[in-house]
Regions:
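Interdomain helical connector at the RecA1-RecA2 junction of SF1/SF2 helicase-like NTPases
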Residues: 72, 78-89, 98-102
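Short, flexible loop/turn elements at secondary-structure junctions
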Residues: 19-24, 60-66, 75, 148-150, ...
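Mg2+-dependent endonuclease catalytic cores in nucleic-acid-processing enzymes, primarily RNase H-like
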Residues: 89-183
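Generic recognition of flexible, low-complexity loop/linker segments
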Residues: 41-48, 55-62, 129-135, 141-143, ...
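Gly/Thr-rich phosphate-binding beta-strand-loop-beta motif of the actin/hexokinase/Hsp70
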Residues: 51-77, 83
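ATPase catalytic-site recognition across NTP-hydrolyzing enzymes
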Residues: 1-57
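Extended hydrophobic-aromatic, low-complexity segments
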Residues: 68-70, 81-85, 155-156, 181
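Conserved acidic
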Residues: 1-4, 85-91
């Protein structure tokens, strides 16, 4: 019955009743790009992007002691013009304790290399800055888009890594970003 109702209904049924974790929840109000997300599933590393790209941009969303710090790197393949992406998240061990219901998911992300659990405040932003430094030193960095709310420590870490201030652009989240995401 669920299969006949469509992909979204089938995924929901399998998730709820067969204990199958589904990669994307394809709700009716989903982002339009979600329909194409899984078919683009080839894993790309940061090193792949550094070797193949002619330009790279970085997006950073700051976290805090009870939230994730996320970084996403997008590079354009110099031969195919295909966009390549790699992301990583950091979470402080305090957040793992506070969000016990998410702890096993955090561990899954750690196990596949997509997340780091940090013990000391500042280790996360130092690692972000190190990744950005590598991109900058490869002379591929165009700009860094960052939500300007509460990012002092990230900006300090980027400056300490030698990233020029003019490379950082504030991109507010919420309604200001919503229109661009829907295209």
């Amino acid at each position: 019955k669920a299969r006949e109702a469509g992909e979204e209904a089938f995924r929901g049924f399998m998730s709820k009743h067969a204990n199958v974790e589904i990669g994307l929840a394809l709700r009716s109000d989903r982002w339009a790009g979600a329909d194409f997300w899984e078919q683009q599933g080839r894993r790309v590393s940061l090193d792949d992007i550094l070797q193949r790209a002619d330009v790279v941009t970085v997006g950073i969303d700051g976290g805090g002691l009870d939230d994730l710090l996320g970084m996403y790197v997008i590079g354009r393949d110099r031969e195919t013009r295909e966009w390549l992406g790699w992301g990583h998240a950091w979470v402080h061990e305090t957040a793992v304790v506070r969000r016990k219901s998410e702890a096993s998911r955090f561990q899954d992300f750690v196990a596949c290399g997509d997340m780091t659990i940090v013990r000391r405040v500042g280790d996360d932003t130092a690692e972000v800055a190190e990744y950005v430094r590598r991109i900058h030193e490869a002379e591929l960095l165009d700009h860094i888009g960052i939500d300007p709310s509460g990012v002092g420590q990230i900006l300090d870490s980027l400056a300490e890594a030698g990233i020029p201030d003019e490379s950082v652009v504030g991109i507010s989240q919420g309604w200001k970003l919503g229109g661009a995401i829907k295209t």
